[in-house]
């Protein structure tokens, strides 16, 4: 047995392309198919320190950490030419079994990362099968005063799915389109975040609030004058925001790489107050957050504003301030004309439509619009109508969806 093994290796050594050198033959035997126990050479990225003043050096110094490379650079310091840090592929030795394990892990990660187009759930009970719930998307029309976790929990209980997530969150007081992803479709979150989203709603011009919303306790309906603004002023201010986001050299614009817009994004500061909803209630309160100087990039593709005909008394918190004046008018006048004027003029209510890319900062956009008009502005009502190519008209109303899911899912 030893003779055959010796003859075999001797024959391989004699016919090796490396010649009769012992070190070359040994290196050739390490890479032979029959010697799997020997380590194999592979290439890794390391930090290489080169000294241009010493070109006669045999090999550059190599380090795997930045700190060690800097220490070696100080040792190689030269007055004429400073050392340079550059990445370089170097050889290392790992076993073939470890190489196979690494290849299998890379292949498994590639297979898991390959996103299969999910099924849009449109009919019941056909789209409630396990294979659909493992990779599906459900369009939901969220009513106001519903938290996103409440919507996700209600749908998950009704369908019995293992994994449900909302890839496009929405404020509790806002209504409109939500995307609920089942199973592996939750990998769509980065793509949905980069998609364009359209919002519609109303804003109160002249009113101010710490949170930028009329539901906050600090809201004042007519803090600054806004009745003198004409329709032309409103259109020019809205078009000015779109022009600034489209590439005009204005203060506060930074470059971004989105393909859908003009290539620039408005940079805004986050608010130090946010609006929170009381548990199991439709009331809200303002909560102070830690101030931050981190700016938020907001890409604006379209922004249109038009005047509302009149402000109803039951529409939001802006009209609630005038209910007491109307009641006092009926008690005193008994049908006669009340000569007293309210303590503040009525705020200007406008309708708007905005198309944003990335994470939505509608309150910051409304506040920025008010500053361009030399007044204040607060968000009154908000509804999301589009996410990419999805429209709210194709979504299921939540009040009608949950009973249907409970009836067909189990």
Curated annotation (Swiss-Prot):
Location relative to the cell: Plastid, Chloroplast
Biased composition (Polar residues): 26-35
SUPFAM superfamilies in the cross-refs: Pseudouridine synthase (SSF55120)
Biased composition (Low complexity): 14-25, 96-106
GO MF assignments: pseudouridine synthase activity; RNA binding
Mutagenesis or variant effect for residue 171 to G/S: No loss of function
Keywords associated with the record: Chloroplast, mRNA processing, mRNA splicing, Plastid, Transit peptide
Transit peptide stretch: 1-46
Transmembrane segments: none
UniProt record similarity statement: Belongs to the pseudouridine synthase TruB family.
Name this polypeptide is given: Trans-splicing factor Raa2, chloroplastic
Source species: Chlamydomonas reinhardtii (Chlamydomonas smithii)
């Amino acid at each position: 047995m030893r003779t055959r093994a010796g003859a075999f290796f001797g024959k391989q050594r004699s016919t090796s392309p490396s010649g009769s050198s012992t070190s070359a033959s040994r290196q050739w035997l390490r890479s032979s198919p029959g010697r799997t126990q020997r380590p194999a050479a592979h290439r890794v990225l390391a930090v290489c320190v080169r000294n241009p003043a010493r070109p006669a050096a045999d090999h550059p110094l190599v380090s795997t950490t930045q700190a060690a490379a800097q220490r070696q650079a100080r040792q190689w310091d030269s007055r004429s030419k400073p050392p340079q840090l550059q990445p370089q592929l170097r050889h290392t030795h790992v076993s073939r079994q470890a190489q196979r394990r690494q290849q299998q892990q890379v292949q498994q990660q590639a297979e898991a990362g390959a996103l299969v187009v999910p099924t849009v759930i449109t009919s019941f009970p056909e789209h409630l099968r396990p294979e659909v719930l493992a990779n599906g998307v459900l369009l939901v029309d969220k009513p106001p005063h519903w938290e996103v976790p409440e919507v996700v929990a209600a749908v998950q209980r009704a369908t019995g799915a293992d994994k449900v997530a909302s890839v496009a969150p929405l404020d509790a007081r806002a209504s409109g389109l939500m995307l609920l992803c089942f199973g592996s479709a939750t990998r769509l979150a980065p793509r949905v975040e980069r998609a364009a989203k359209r919002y519609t709603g109303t804003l109160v011009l002249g009113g101010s609030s710490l949170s930028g919303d009329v539901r906050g306790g600090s809201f004042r309906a007519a803090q600054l004058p806004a009745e003198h603004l004409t329709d032309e002023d409103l259109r020019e201010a809205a078009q000015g925001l779109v022009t600034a986001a489209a590439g005009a050299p204005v203060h506060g614009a930074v470059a971004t790489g989105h393909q859908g817009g003009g290539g620039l994004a408005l940079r805004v500061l986050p608010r130090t107050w946010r609006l929170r909803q009381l548990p199991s209630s439709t009331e809200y309160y303002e909560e102070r957050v830690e101030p931050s100087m981190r700016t938020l990039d907001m890409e604006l593709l379209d922004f249109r504003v038009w005047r509302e005909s009149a402000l109803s008394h039951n529409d939001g918190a802006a009209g609630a301030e005038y209910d007491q004046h109307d009641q006092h008018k009926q008690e005193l006048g008994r049908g006669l004309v009340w000569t007293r004027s309210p303590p503040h003029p009525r705020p200007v209510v406008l309708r708007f439509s905005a198309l944003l890319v990335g994470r939505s900062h509608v309150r910051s956009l409304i506040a920025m619009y008010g500053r361009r008009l030399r007044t204040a502005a607060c968000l009154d009502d908000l509804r999301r109508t589009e996410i990419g190519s999805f429209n709210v008209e194709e979504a299921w109303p939540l009040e009608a969806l949950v009973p249907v899911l409970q009836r067909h899912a189990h």
